[in-house]
Amino acid sequence: MKQAFSERISSALTLRKQAGLTRARTVIEQGNQSRLSVDGKSYLNFSGNDYLGLAGSQELTQAWQQGLSLYGSGSGASPLVTGYSKPHADLESQLAEWLGFDCAVLFNSGFSANQAVLFSLLEKGDQVVQDKLNHASLMEAGILSPASMKRFKHNDVAHLDKLLKASICNPSLVVTEGVFSMDGDLSPLSELSRVTKENNAWFMVDDAHGCGVLGSHGRGCCDLYQITPDILVVTFGKAFGLSGAAVLCNVECGDYLSQFARHHVYSTAMPPAQAHALSHALSMIQQQEWRRKKLDELSQQFESELRLCVGVITTQTPIKPIIIGDSETAIALSDSLKEKGMWTTAIRPPTVPLGTARLRVTLSANHSEKDIKLLTQAITELR
């Protein structure tokens, strides 16, 4: 029996390698900012999710250091024991007020927040209907939950409506993302929200890549489309420059999650110093509009300079995919850019569908016009 596990592991690794899909962790020596250092060499970083440039901000670092001085290193317990402190409560209140909800519940990651909602909310006889390109955390939770799961074609409102009308399950939960992380495109939230309400279903939006970047003062995609879903998930590992997540909902749903969401109940709470730093990151997002303005300008520059380049997808976000096709060519292009001092990651199946391997270029407010020019010139030469 023990040998069966070893054989399974060996076989899986061999097949992954033969398919050219093996991934490796890279040791970053000096931070994950607009420049990074690997094996003693400096690269322009176009692979991170630090959209507003807060991850390396000295102002935010000082806020975390202040939190450490005030509250120590760790929370010491789960939230329902003694791990929930004033910085956690303050952050939840600030998020709820900012995003227009009654309640917020903190989690240690966006992955755990998404799974916690689906696992705690869905029961046998329920239905969850998800966009076909939703994040792995949502898809996995939907498959493993006791509910019936269906997928609607990407951003296809009519298909969602058809699935909901044909369903005999009740209740139904519709789940989508605000910004899709691999294509950088937006979900048609207004239409999806309308169809969901017409079919008496609940609507959940994961706005990991929109919150902080889009909408009034960075409130995200729901603000951009002027909708209020039943459940909103925001994460802190992108525009906030830190880590963690929160689920926004009404008070009763928040109480329910606090009681039944096992990822929340049985996990050590995030350090209070981190919550303190996140509150400061939130104030920076709200007040430092120049970061979003600069990001927009860099985005326009990137697309203008690559307007004739095959495979470049135009987006309203700092995520700029360049569709290559096969994995080998995508890896070769990524390696060639690294030789020129630019770090771009080749995204391959199973993360994206077969035949759509790509470079996932991401921009940050910490980049300069010169940085973008260097990248676009290099891509033009190599393509």
From Swiss-Prot:
Gene Ontology biological process terms, A to Z:
biotin biosynthetic process
Residues the record lists as N6-(pyridoxal phosphate)lysine modifications: K238
Transmembrane parts of this sequence: none
Which sites bind substrate?
Answer: R23, H135, T351
Entry-linked InterPro entries: Aminotrans_II_pyridoxalP_BS (IPR001917), Aminotransferase_I/II_large (IPR004839), AON_synthase_class-II (IPR050087), AONS_Archaea/Proteobacteria (IPR004723), AONS_Proteobacteria (IPR022834), PyrdxlP-dep_Trfase (IPR015424), PyrdxlP-dep_Trfase_major (IPR015421), PyrdxlP-dep_Trfase_small (IPR015422)
EC class: transferase
Record keywords = Biotin biosynthesis, Pyridoxal phosphate, Transferase
- Family assignment? Belongs to the class-II pyridoxal-phosphate-dependent aminotransferase family. BioF subfamily.
- So what does this one do? Catalyzes the decarboxylative condensation of pimeloyl-[acyl-carrier protein] and L-alanine to produce 8-amino-7-oxononanoate (AON), [acyl-carrier protein], and carbon dioxide.
Q: How would you summarize the oligomeric state and partners of this protein? A: Homodimer.
Q: What is this protein called?
A: 8-amino-7-oxononanoate synthase
Q: What is the lineage of its organism?
A: Bacteria, Pseudomonadati, Pseudomonadota, Gammaproteobacteria, Vibrionales
